[in-house]
Amino acid sequence: MLKYVDLKEKPSSFLAATGITDEEFQALLPNFETAYRQLYATNLTFQAQPRRRSFGGGREAKLASFADRLLFILNYQKTNPLQTMHGLSFGLSQGQVNYWIHRLLPVLRQALAAMGMTPERDGAQVATASSASEGGANLSVDGTERRIHRPVNAEQQKAKYSGKKKAHTDKNILLVNENTKKVVYLSATTEGKKHDKKLAEESLIRYPKNATLTKDTGFQGYEPEGVLTAQPKKRRKMKS
């Protein structure tokens, strides 16, 4: 069963499980605990009923510590597993996993926002976002896809099927500051079938003055006004 106290002793495994280092985890943890206490009163049970015994009393819960709760939600976000499989990693039933996911995601979002680490979701705001110009407005754009369960509806199956991934997916585009490696912008989630270029155009991103933009072939033809774009050429494989 995954526990923070055990996993932190294995740096490479910790990074693979959460996407961050233990040092970054420790910086996030106090904000995560503060956000949790702000969102959920500790004098109430998880069902919002008055608590009869003191908080932390009784049998120890599987996710008793804030460190384990943060590990749980970061690992879920990083790996996107089936809830049943995620439960096996933390000793929880599928129902308990579903409960904790919905309880902890708002906490994580609030904690990251308090640290100024949440990306813009409105493309029009990118031009004035300090994160976009930090160190110079050298940006890169990329599409990211996540596998999803095959939809039951036939039309949804067609819309969600990504020819690139040969699977049913959801898609977003990310705008990253190449100087700081921070995600500046995260688009709305859309079906995996949609092309990267089309999603970028629909996002109506406004760029800072004198911005440069690195893109791949998925964004060929995407030329925002006033932005110097570059598309690195792929090396051709040498025939043996």
State what each model feature region is.
Residues 30, 34-41, 78-82, 106, ...:
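Short helix-loop boundary/capping segments at the starts of domains
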Residues 17, 61, 74-75, 90-93:
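Short secondary-structure transition/capping motifs
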Residues 80-240:
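Short, well-ordered secondary-structure "scaffold" segments embedded in the functional core
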Residues 59-67, 162:
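Structural motif
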Residues 65-79:
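Short, amphipathic alpha-helical "recognition" segments used to contact nucleic acids or chromatin
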